[in-house]
């Protein structure tokens, strides 16, 4: 096994590391008024200002300098933020830490010190007009050129959003040379994105990996293990529902979540 912490590079580290992080929050809102209220709530909870704060903390975690911030709230709903970043000097200790496959910090652990390419986020609130199911999706992309991997921000991102389903894609492209001229197509150890998840996250979520190791492509998706109907009802409680209605709503929500997790529509007669 290559000891990535001891590779001496010739010139700049030319590897590009990209993390795509997609979260889904699912909700049931029975009436048209409740559905509108849910969309308004999500639109306010994850507006451009809040998303800018999250992405700025991501920049801090990966050790990047923020060069420019562009953000926009959209009408009727949705928001996007793009942050241009640049790599700064990386200490030997930071380089060694980035080569290790381990979870990054949690939101409460982030303290400031900034000095890679770009970070973007887009939000997509939507709702089903008949079955009452509403879904909020946020897409975050972190792309860096240099030593530190965007995976160090993964733990923070998961804890920053209230996510029912999460899909993550990580890839490394390009190569860098050591002082002897040998090419290195990856500069840190990894066999799964799960290496970077904290233990509490692994306990809360069921996970599935699809990895193409020889191409440096890693994919992990997660869905919450526990299902409590009250966590998904907007504007009412399960105590307000009779048993038949509660079971119907539960089936609608579980089907929505499993189809998002599977990435396809499931047969109508398939139990979920």
From Swiss-Prot:
Modification after translation, per record: Is synthesized initially as an inactive proenzyme. Formation of the active enzyme involves a self-maturation process in which the active site pyruvoyl group is generated from an internal serine residue via an autocatalytic post-translational modification. Two non-identical subunits are generated from the proenzyme in this reaction, and the pyruvate is formed at the N-terminus of the alpha chain, which is derived from the carboxyl end of the proenzyme.
In-chain residues carrying the UniProt-annotated modification Pyruvic acid (Ser): 117
Gene3D superfamilies attached to this UniProt entry: S-adenosylmethionine decarboxylase
Catalytic activity: S-adenosyl-L-methionine + H(+) = S-adenosyl 3-(methylsulfanyl)propylamine + CO2
GO molecular function, one term: adenosylmethionine decarboxylase activity
Cell membrane among keywords: no
Sorted UniProt keywords: Autocatalytic cleavage, Decarboxylase, Lyase, Polyamine biosynthesis, Pyruvate, S-adenosyl-L-methionine, Schiff base, Spermidine biosynthesis, Zymogen
EC number: 4.1.1.50
Similarity comment: family membership: Belongs to the prokaryotic AdoMetDC family. Type 2 subfamily.
Subunit structure as annotated in this protein's UniProt entry: Heterooctamer of four alpha and four beta chains arranged as a tetramer of alpha/beta heterodimers.
UniProt-recorded name of the protein: S-adenosylmethionine decarboxylase proenzyme
Species of the source: Halorhodospira halophila (strain DSM 244 / SL1)
Encoding gene per record: speD
